[in-house]
């Protein structure tokens, strides 16, 4: 995997949506990992901003993330609105901003699903689309 960049965006629905829209249109970007903004405060705008961009929701991501998080933070996991989806051939993962949540998401879900060696299935073939066609 190659990191193409890091972008910090204010918790504003339209700024978040604009930045992610630009990234999913970029043929070099295959995956986006967003952290923060998935809770229940007035500033947690990531779901509202990003969900409308998805062609396909990956419902199982949020479900599995909360199941794994339950092992670590018990019932507090219900406050997470972690989610993922495919948009223009780019997979977008949105996870809570805490270091523990980011580690859980990467180590126990995302890294495996972005590896072509993970069986029986992974997201790699979903990402190998020509965005220019």
Predicted regions and their residues:
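Non-catalytic beta/alpha edge segments that cap or flank active sites
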Residues: 1-133
């Amino acid at each position: 995997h190659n990191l193409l960049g890091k972008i910090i965006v204010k918790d504003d629905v339209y700024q978040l949506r604009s930045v992610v829209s630009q990234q999913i249109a970029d043929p070099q970007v295959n995956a986006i990992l967003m952290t923060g903004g998935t809770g229940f405060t007035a500033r947690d705008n990531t779901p509202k901003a990003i969900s409308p961009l998805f062609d396909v929701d990956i419902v199982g991501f949020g479900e599995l993330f909360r199941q794994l998080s339950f092992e670590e933070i018990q019932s507090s996991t219900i406050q997470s609105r972690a989610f993922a989806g495919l948009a223009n051939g780019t997979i977008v993962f949105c996870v809570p901003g805490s270091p523990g949540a980011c580690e859980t998401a990467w180590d126990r879900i995302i890294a495996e699903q972005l590896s072509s060696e993970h069986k029986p299935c992974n997201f790699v073939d979903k990402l190998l689309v020509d965005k220019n066609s």
